[in-house]
């Protein structure tokens, strides 16, 4: 049994949403003369270029686009909002329309727009701590605040993280009940990204919430990717969100918006959160491009997410079979049946070797199978994430197997080059 305040961070190596640097590195000079950071940056640029030019990809996201392309994506904004309305000023207008839309989807009394999820969650849990008188927040050691936010909970908001477990799975109701110190809030990341985008079962989620109630704690969902969780739970968004006292959702991950987040919950909490949003510097003068992109994502991407999740399972099964057929000594698709439209792939090679093989495959065949970074914190073991979106729906299982075969050829070439 484990429940303690800190650390235990790297149970699974860090792979932040913004891990890789985007600073441009000149192409001159042999790669051997570059620093490690310069090599990573050059590889990032090659992968981005390959993603843009590839004829076939499993997912295309705004992160890989151009400014011109992203601006063009707002051409359809008139379908979701009256563009003859005045621009927003400090959170009114289109921002309020977005807040009402989110509250309606999640079945909450109100919602508040935030420029970032980091700010939204700190504000939410700070508000709950003020009401309960307890700044302790029970959460997973792999939760986003513990791994990707530079100790913001404690350094900025006076909150105290209490880790329920560091195992690469969701915490259990018994771990919540057995935590030897009191806590004011239970924070559940749904899905838990760094463990493989894992979700509990619907029954397990209800048990977790009930265990928190037994401890007189409120329940907050880190729902950055909650939008794509309905297939796994077999429940609509409002029923899922209805289990929690407050919910954070993101607009730029699965919805592919320009940025931004929302905090949803009781009207009194949201009103207080807006006060803290201002104090935290989140009362931005005008946000209509971001708000419009979020409304477009809710209109266009949200209805398609269940289809992405179901097809991700087809892709994952084909990947697993093809890697096994290729005779790799050890490989893993995790989880075997994805809970969302994203999952992990682990391969028994150094990350640099796998990354180079993945980029070469895209450059030489026009098919990008692995479009994200490879983490190599564990020597000789590489891990990446696979995301299936609209472009991935065009892939059959046979297409996946063919792409794996092309990739494995180059993987063995790169491994042979490195190891002589």
Kindly label every feature range from the protein language model:
Residues 111-118, 250-251, 286:
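Active-site nucleophile and cofactor-binding loops and adjacent substrate-binding regions
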Residues 102, 120, 153, 186, ...:
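Buried hydrophobic positions in well-ordered alpha/beta secondary-structure cores of metabolic enzymes
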Residues 129-185:
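PLP-dependent aminotransferase-like
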Residues 38-116, 130, 141-147, 152-154, ...:
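Conserved N-terminal alpha-helix of the aminotransferase class I/II PLP-enzyme fold
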Residues 160-161, 219-220, 369:
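Hydrophobic beta-strand scaffold residues
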Residues 16, 24-40, 326-420:
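Conserved C-terminal alpha-helix-loop-beta "cap" of PLP-dependent enzymes
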Residues 37-38, 194, 199, 242-349, ...:
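Active-site C-terminal subdomain of aminotransferase-like
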Residues 169-224, 228:
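Active-site phosphate-binding strand-loop segment of PLP-dependent enzymes
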């Amino acid at each position: 049994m484990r429940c303690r305040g800190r650390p235990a961070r790297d149970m699974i190596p860090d792979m932040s949403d913004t891990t890789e640097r985007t600073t441009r590195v000149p192409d001159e000079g042999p790669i051997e003369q570059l620093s490690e950071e310069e090599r990573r940056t050059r590889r990032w640029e090659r992968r981005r270029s390959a993603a843009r030019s590839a004829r076939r990809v499993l997912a295309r996201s705004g992160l890989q686009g151009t400014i011109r392309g992203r601006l063009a994506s707002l051409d359809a904004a008139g379908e979701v909002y009256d563009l003859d309305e005045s621009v927003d000023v400090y959170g009114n207008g289109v921002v309020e329309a977005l807040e009402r839309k989110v509250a309606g989807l999640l079945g909450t009394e109100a919602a508040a727009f935030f420029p970032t999820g980091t700010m939204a969650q700190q504000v939410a849990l700070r508000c709950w701590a003020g009401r309960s008188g307890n700044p302790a927040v029970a959460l997973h050691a792999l939760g986003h605040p513990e791994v990707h936010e530079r100790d913001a909970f404690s350094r900025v908001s006076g909150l105290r993280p209490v880790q329920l477990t560091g195992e690469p799975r969701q915490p259990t109701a018994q771990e919540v009940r057995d935590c030897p110190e009191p806590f004011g809030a239970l924070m559940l990341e749904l899905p838990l990204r760094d463990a493989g985008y894992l979700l509990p079962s619907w029954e397990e989620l209800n048990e977790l919430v009930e265990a928190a109630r037994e401890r007189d704690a409120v329940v907050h969902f880190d729902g950055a990717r909650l939008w794509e969780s309905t297939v796994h739970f077999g429940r609509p968004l409002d029923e899922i969100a209805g289990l929690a006292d407050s919910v954070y959702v993101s607009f730029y991950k699965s919805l592919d918006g320009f940025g931004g987040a929302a905090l949803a919950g009781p009207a009194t909490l949201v009103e207080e959160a807006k006060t803290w949003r201002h104090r935290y510097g989140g009362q931005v003068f005008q946000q209509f491009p971001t708000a419009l992109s979020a409304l477009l994502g809710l209109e266009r991407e949200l209805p398609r997410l269940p289809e992405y999740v179901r097809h991700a399972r087809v892709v994952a099964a084909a990947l697993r079979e093809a890697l096994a057929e290729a005779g790799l000594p050890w490989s893993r698709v995790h989880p075997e049946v994805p809970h969302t439209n994203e999952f992990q792939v682990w391969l028994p090679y150094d990350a640099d070797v796998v990354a180079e093989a993945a980029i070469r495959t895209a450059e030489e065949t026009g098919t990008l199978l692995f479009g994200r970074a490879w983490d190599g914190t564990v020597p000789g073991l590489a891990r990446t994430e696979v995301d299936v979106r609209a472009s991935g729906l065009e892939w059959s299982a046979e297409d996946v197997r063919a792409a794996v075969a092309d990739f494995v050829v180059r993987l063995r070439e790169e491994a042979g080059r490195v190891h002589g």
